[in-house]
Regions:
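Preference for long, amphipathic alpha-helical scaffolds in soluble/luminal domains
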Residues: 1-327
Length: 327
């Protein structure tokens, strides 16, 4: 067995579980997988997250890169493989389904300052920089065939253009819009929209506009010295490895784009992959280069030692690129 895999399996239960299914290709029915998953579900950290999420939608979101907000904790638990039927998950899903707009978008509570065109009040609304993440999480949690998911996906696709997703918000937010030109795609909205739709093959594989939107993100990488739509730069901070995947950075972009098979040999994508790869240490482990205060108690919330979760995430991306089961 590869030495990296041996090390990952010694890590937290969620890393062992994801390593076994994502890198080793083991089945959910395998005893080792089932054991790791059971151990994951009884960990205090996981129980605490599920308890917090039971109060969805929780406190108002005031900035979309708030890594401690329930929105990002929802994405995190869904990425771990937690799903319908696990203790506490059905209540979370019920709360999310109760907060879906008439047009299909899942809603959160947000508070937009009047300085940015908002009301300064807590409102149940949606924006294209949050609702795709809820759709993504719901699919990952095992709700893909639910009518609410079909409605949310149709709504999301309807807002896309040939070059991505613009800054669009619920009508209740009035004139609020991000700091960019109206005709520009929002890099972050485009990223998380693609992330959600990549989980639904019938959408991922059938819409030319989705394929062209993946190219938009690669063009932004090509033109990173000239273009910064909606103030999303792709410089030094963008290239720092950090997890959880909350904002617009190299790990998040690669995690999404490598889920589109037609891109895996694209030179622009490979350039980003190579920038990521050279950050490995001699053992092929990866260490966080930037951290998020809300996650400082987790093993990836420090910059001094290699992170199990970050190392897993990088090697999972590399496996998609090589197409090899080399573990």
């Amino acid at each position: 067995m590869n030495e990296v895999i041996k090390w990952l399996i010694e890590g937290p239960p969620w890393v062992e579980y994801l390593t076994r299914i994502g890198l080793l290709g083991q089945q959910e029915s395998d005893l080792e997988v089932a054991t790791a998953r059971h151990r994951m579900l009884i960990q205090p950290e996981i129980k605490n997250l599920l308890s917090e999420l039971s109060e969805w939608p929780g406190p108002a979101l005031k900035r979309h890169n708030d890594a401690g907000h329930l929105l990002h904790k929802l994405v995190f638990i869904s990425d771990l493989g937690i799903r319908v039927g696990d203790t506490g998950v059905d209540r979370i899903i019920k709360r999310i389904l109760e907060n879906q707009s008439q047009d299909g978008a899942f809603q959160i509570t947000a508070n937009i300052s009047p300085q940015y065109g908002g009301s300064g009040r807590d409102q149940l609304v949606w924006m294209l920089c949050d609702t795709p993440s809820i759709l993504y999480s719901m699919v990952k949690l095992g709700m893909r065939e639910h009518p609410a998911i079909h409605s949310a996906a149709r709504h999301l696709v309807s807002l896309g253009t040939d070059n991505g997703w613009p800054c669009v918000v619920a009508s209740e937010l009035g004139k609020f819009r991000g700091p960019g030109r109206k005709t520009d795609p929002c890099p972050y909205a485009t990223l998380i929209a693609l992330k959600a739709l990549a989980q639904i093959p019938e959408w991922r594989d059938s819409k030319p506009s989705i394929r062209s939107s993946t190219d938009t993100l690669l063009k932004l990488w090509e033109q990173r010295k000239e273009r910064r739509p909606y103030m999303f730069a792709m410089g030094t901070d963008f290239a720092k490895l950090k997890t959880p995947m909350v904002w617009y950075d190299i790990l998040h972009v690669l995690e999404v784009l490598t889920q589109f098979p037609h891109l895996v040999k694209d030179a622009r994508l490979i350039e980003m992959v190579n920038i990521m790869k050279i950050k490995a240490d001699e053992q092929e482990y990866f260490t966080s280069e930037s951290t998020r205060k809300a996650w400082s108690n987790w093993e990836f919330g420090q910059k001094k030692a290699p992170s199990y979760l970050l190392t897993l995430q990088v090697h999972r991306i590399l496996k998609r690129i090589t197409g090899l089961s080399l573990y």
